[in-house]
Amino acid sequence: MNRTKPCVETAAIAHKALIAREARRVTSYDVALVAGVSQSAVSRCFQQGASVSDATLARVMKAAALLDYIPNAAARSLITRRSNIVAVLIASQANLQYPELLGELSQHIGARGRRVLLFTLARETDVDRVLADVWQYQVDGVIAAARLSSEHIAEFDRRRMPLVLFNRSLRERAVNTVTCDHHEAGRMLVSRLAAAGHRRFGIIAGLEDSSVAQERRRGASERLAELGLPAPVVVPGQADYASGAAGLRAIISAMGAVPDAIICGSDVTAIGCLDCARHELGIEVPRQLSVAGFDAVESSNWLSYNLTTLRQPMPRMAMAAAELLCTVIDRSGGVAAPERRVFSAQFINGATARLEPVFSSVLGPALGAAQVHGTGLPAPVAIM
């Protein structure tokens, strides 16, 4: 004899009264009782792609709505073995663009049904400590805007943890990566300045343990050597305001004169350099000295600075990182070759560098536009 399932609305009214008397939260068991189905059927209704009939789904969703039921993410993760949480590792001192990055990542990861759990590093050398914290959480994957070693990558592989490196690269092995071409950016900046007649360069470096800063400096130094120009005077920096003034004074002391151009590891350092040049040393920028930064942070565009700099396409890079990681997670153990998605920096022609097209004999008549503005180094996936 077939039993008729109870009316969902009637059952919900009675059951809500019971829950109120017991002063407890609604569970999937309550939804199952009201809908007249098993608790496992309720669980399947809240699992994307699970097999469930239209009739059962309709009853469960109606019961859940009437009971104000909110699925327990932690309990669901025990069943699906997916937490729908992505860990994001960020070296907090490395780049003032990273608050923008975090917002973009949260948006794009959220659009794919997942949430972000943030881990910050005071310095990139703190990776071991932070990873020890990450392993304590049941995350589905990691986006790391921090420097990882081959040993760290091996640990990700051992744990079968999906990983995407953001704005970092690892030469020793292939890893899923989304990055700006910082080596090319350094070359581009030197090419622009050299084309306008600059000969003597100083570099105020970024954080010593930052691979981004190292790649930018390497690209700039390589390009100067290719053009037959003197090697730059390089002084250390901390990607902060104070490094700009200290670096400018150190470069002038080492050279015995004001250089033609100073390339700074960050915009904040460049702003410190500008303020020192203009207000402490009486150097006219850009007539006597050109100053360039990196990253195009908000303050670099303020009227009092209008900094010559390079901008990373952070929104597009964040979208690519979210898409790549979620694709790897959804692959469910399938094997695919790691991807490397490379983006080009955008040159921002501000008011702190002399950039008239001199094209002297140092560059030579045979140099084409691609050589002046970059190096044309091949990248596995170049995204303009």
What is each model feature region?
Residues 1-9, 14, 19-23, 85-191, ...:
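Alpha-helical recognition/docking segments in bacterial nutrient-uptake
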Residues 1-81, 376-378, 383-384:
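N-terminal helix-turn-helix DNA-binding module of bacterial transcription factors
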Residues 5, 13, 232, 250-384:
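Flexible loop/turn connectors
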Residues 38, 140, 199-200, 230, ...:
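Short acidic/polar active-site loop segments enriched in Thr and Asp
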Residues 63, 104-108, 155, 215-227, ...:
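Alpha-helical structural signal in soluble globular domains
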Residues 91-100, 118-126, 168, 178-188, ...:
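Hinge/beta->alpha junction and helix N-cap segments in small-molecule ligand-binding domains
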Residues 39-44, 78-94, 200-207:
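Short beta-strand segments enriched in small/hydrophobic residues
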